[in-house]
Amino acid sequence: MKIDQGKIITALFFLLIFSITFILLYLSRRKREKQNLVLLNREADKNNLRVSKFNTWGNTSIGMDETANVVFFTKKTADGDTGLQMAIAETEKCRIDNIKRTQSNEDGNYTLTEKLELVFEPRDKKKGEMAFPFFNMAYDGAMLTGELQQAEKWCRIINERITGFAQNK
């Protein structure tokens, strides 16, 4: 059976286009991750700390200096960059605030997440809570894209650190 040379060239052309698309998407994501890590390191540098554990997604990053027990957070939005940090020694508890609202349409009711925050409750009750804004429908779009899983992961990590810190006192 003889294969048409034109079909082979066409197939190779589409394979090349397909491959280039995925390579460009990968490189774009890696570039954004590096930019997020630069912002996170800048936040850590403010107090001469270093990021030893981190995650980035979209325009958001969270990290920790595991030696100093400080958590860092950065987020890029149209309004500018947000950089926050919280010392675990000053934290009583970490929790997730998942602020939702219910809407209706002809298909029935559905729930939308308006905000998703990682909230730090301070040991000193005179100080207010600090929140890391993982997701806000106003500037992140209408759908969560992994923010809830990241919030759950980091809430668990931070609470384990808080428990360890309290036991070592």
Where are the language model's segments positioned?
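Short, surface-exposed coil-to-beta transition loops
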Residues: 57-58, 81, 113-116
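Short polybasic amphipathic segments
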Residues: 69-74, 116-120
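Acidic, Ser/Thr- and proline-rich intrinsically disordered linker/docking segments
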Residues: 94-169
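Structured surface patches comprising rigid loops and adjacent beta-strands/short helices at the edges
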Residues: 84-96
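Short aromatic-glycine motifs in intrinsically disordered, low-complexity regions
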Residues: 72-85
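Short connector loops at helix/strand junctions that flank enzyme active sites
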Residues: 66, 88, 113-115
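N-terminal hydrophobic targeting signals that begin at the initiator methionine
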Residues: 1-2
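Anionic N-terminal interaction surfaces
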Residues: 5-72
